[in-house]
Amino acid sequence: MNNNFNFSFHTSYKFILIAFCSCCINTATAFYKTDPNDTTPVSTQKDAILFIEKIKQLESSAYWPNVKPELFLKNLKENIYTPLSLYEGSNTNFCGYAALSYFPLHDDPLGYAKFMLELFYKGKAKFGKVFIQPSSEILKAAGTLKFKGILDIRPADQVWFLCLADHFKGYVNFFNKHYDEGDENTFWASVNYAKFNRMVKQLFNYAVNTRGYDLMHPHINDLYGYISDKMKTGTVVLYLNNAELYKKKHNTLRPATPTHYIILLGISRTEEMITMTYWDYGFRSLRQITPAFFKKIIFGISCCTKKLSHE
């Protein structure tokens, strides 16, 4: 095959692929505008409390042999009463799943509680557009994770994190798609940026506006101004280099890649410093950093907005 023909073939192939993707995107957009039922499910903490307090005791599940029902119910109630207490666990790669948990626990805790109880009783359940049916390895693993801090005694969170990691796959999971003991701290559990945004859309039906990449910083001139504006319209998730944010010795070389998701709760700026308040799984954090360092650590900005009406 000569070079001219080879170039022509690959150019045509790329054009067809781009055209097909464009068609899919336009079709999806049109559907969103015409479907009156395409809204984000919402409920209140009071709704969830009234529901969960009617349940005094759970029987053991035939599907989750290592999950103690009394601890499972206790964990659910803790998440509903104090949603910011949810914790990814020590030495795990569950941070992406912990971060997205902010959405159901704050905006649809009743939907979350019903899903978790159905998953416990039936071994499978549907959340939003996603049908979750965990593998046999996950059914056996939940309730057995050890040396993960408070996650050791929070089996509902173990079920939630393991099921999400088992169901959703991104390119970072390509070489390890099936769970083996200890995989909660390997690439099996990792969450790349596109995978995170896809989970928020499919599970909770949010409109997600994104800027960023896995390996490059977003090209935004006024990063602080952009993020401040996005906070006025929705919940902002920052995808950042956690090693840089928390390193103690600033002369230590660190890999310049993002590893962590945080929920931004507040942001302000003076001439020399930017102050961030954010949820970092288990507690609120407050950090003051320079604008240059702020730009250095951020790789992705996702603004997640509830679909409440259609224009």
Regions found by a protein language model. Name each.
Residues 1-32:
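Bacterial Sec-dependent N-terminal signal peptides
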Residues 20-23, 94, 303:
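The N-terminal extracellular segments of secreted preproproteins, especially immediately downstream
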Residues 35, 40-176, 231-237:
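Active-site nucleophile-adjacent alpha helix/oxyanion-hole segment immediately C-terminal to the catalytic cysteine
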Residues 95, 102, 243-246, 284:
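Solvent-exposed loop/turn segments at secondary-structure junctions
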Residues 150-182, 187-190, 237-242, 271-277, ...:
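Non-catalytic membrane-recruitment/adaptor modules and adjacent regulatory linkers
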Residues 174-220:
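Hydrophobic, aromatic-enriched interface-forming segments
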Residues 252-259, 268-311:
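Cys-His-centered catalytic/binding microenvironment captured across papain-like cysteine peptidases
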